[in-house]
């Protein structure tokens, strides 16, 4: 059975809304990537070294990342040889299969959010300004509420003009309380208040916003360390998630940001925003494979429910949906 057929069976068991969101959200990447792959397989009669060289360029242009592309091409060559594949069209299914394998290989890291019943779950959102961090917090609060959890938001970005007000708008929109102080206050003090407010309300989840820019990078990272210490002191083993918000449209720049933040704080997962706004959705694989950080959330559109938990099969379906849907029944 081809991988596309297996994927089709798995996707049909999912709720339609999830698979459709990945399909819609990855439309730009799919159109660009699939068109290039279709063009490639139509021009070649056989799978040879020239074919793989061109495929390499297609994958790099999708921001899959050089190291990951080299690994993927090596795996494809072995698989093509093992299965004695001659027809370039048959390689498409193998590409999708290997993309899922590469994402799932390596470090055993869980893609699901670390949310457990019977405790206050503390989620810290970090990232530079302009990547959609506050919007992600608002959408995540909505998602948690839809799942029946009580949520509190902490307006820990006291530095950026308008950040507190922006979070308050999301609080009103989602019906979630926002704990805040005045602009310029000590972020650690805001988080301290928020932890106690969340405990007093017996909340399930506390989501904390943080500054994305201070006078310099050293100050920003020190601020994050201080906030983390406050959380650790008040809630043992917290924060349970430190999610780094990255803008998918910035490509390799996002990789550089991830490296910087990983040095300063223990990033447990990536919230990849604006994936619907780029034709270079391969960044997901580069982050996972080269930085060894799982992508936990993806922004697939403008709507409040367009933030989804990342799933590698749904992602590959989004890239190859036209071919998956044509798979033999």
Swiss-Prot record:
Output the SUPFAM superfamilies linked to this UniProt entry.
Domain of the SRP/SRP receptor G-proteins, P-loop containing nucleoside triphosphate hydrolases
- Residues reported to bind GTP: 127-134, 209-213, 273-276
Please name the GO terms of the biological process aspect recorded for this protein, alphabetically: protein targeting; SRP-dependent cotranslational protein targeting to membrane
Would you say which domain of life the source belongs to? Bacteria
Assembly and interaction partners: Part of the signal recognition particle protein translocation system, which is composed of SRP and FtsY.
Q: Which family does it belong to?
A: Belongs to the GTP-binding SRP family. FtsY subfamily.
Q: What EC designation does it have?
A: 3.6.5.4
Q: Which reaction does it catalyse?
A: GTP + H2O = GDP + phosphate + H(+)
Name the predominant localization: membrane
Q: Name one GO cellular component term.
A: cytoplasm
Q: What does this protein do?
A: Involved in targeting and insertion of nascent membrane proteins into the cytoplasmic membrane. Acts as a receptor for the complex formed by the signal recognition particle (SRP) and the ribosome-nascent chain (RNC).
NCBIfam families with a match to the protein in the record: ftsY
Membrane topology listed for this record = Peripheral membrane protein
| Location within or outside the cell | Cell membrane; Cytoplasm
Organism (species) = Bacillus subtilis (strain 168)
Give GO terms: molecular function aspect only.
ATP hydrolysis activity; GTP binding; GTPase activity; signal recognition particle binding
Q: Which keywords label this protein?
A: Cell membrane, Cytoplasm, GTP-binding, Hydrolase, Membrane, Nucleotide-binding, Receptor
Q: Return the protein name.
A: Signal recognition particle receptor FtsY
| InterPro entries with a match to the protein in the record | AAA+_ATPase, P-loop_NTPase, Signal_recog_particl_SRP54_hlx, SR_rcpt_FtsY, SRP/SRP_N, SRP54_GTPase_dom, SRP54_N_sf
């Amino acid at each position: 059975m081809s991988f596309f057929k297996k994927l089709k069976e798995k996707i049909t068991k999912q709720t339609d809304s999830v698979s459709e969101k990945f399909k819609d959200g990855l439309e730009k990447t799919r159109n660009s990537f699939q068109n290039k792959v279709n063009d490639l397989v139509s021009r070649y009669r056989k799978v040879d070294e020239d074919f793989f060289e061109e495929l390499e360029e297609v994958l790099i242009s999708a921001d899959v990342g050089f190291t990951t592309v080299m690994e993927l091409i090596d795996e494809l060559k072995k698989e093509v040889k093992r299965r004695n594949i001659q027809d370039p069209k048959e390689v498409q299914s193998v590409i999708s299969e290997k993309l899922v394998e590469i994402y799932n290989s390596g470090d055993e890291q869980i893609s699901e959010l670390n949310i457990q019943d019977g405790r206050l779950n503390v989620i810290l959102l970090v990232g530079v300004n302009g990547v959609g961090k506050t919007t992600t917090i608002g959408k995540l609060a909505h998602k948690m509420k839809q799942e029946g959890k009580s949520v509190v938001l902490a307006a820990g970005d006291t530095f950026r003009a308008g950040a507190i007000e922006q979070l308050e708008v999301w609080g009103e929109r989602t019906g979630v309380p926002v704990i805040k102080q005045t602009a310029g206050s000590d972020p650690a003090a805001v988080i301290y208040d928020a932890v106690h407010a969340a405990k007093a309300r017996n909340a399930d989840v506390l989501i904390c916003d943080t500054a994305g820019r201070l006078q310099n990078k050293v100050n920003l990272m020190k601020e994050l360390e201080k906030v983390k210490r406050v959380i650790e002191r008040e809630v043992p083993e917290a924060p349970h998630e430190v999610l780094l918000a990255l803008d998918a449209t910035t490509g390799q720049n996002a990789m550089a940001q991830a490296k910087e933040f990983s040095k300063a704080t223990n990033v447990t997962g990536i919230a990849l925003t604006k994936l619907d706004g780029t034709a270079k959705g391969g960044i997901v694989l580069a982050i996972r494979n080269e930085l060894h950080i799982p992508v936990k959330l993806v922004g697939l559109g403008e709507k409040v429910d367009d933030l989804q938990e990342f799933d590698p099969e749904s992602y590959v379906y989004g890239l190859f949906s036209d071919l998956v849907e044509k798979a033999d029944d």
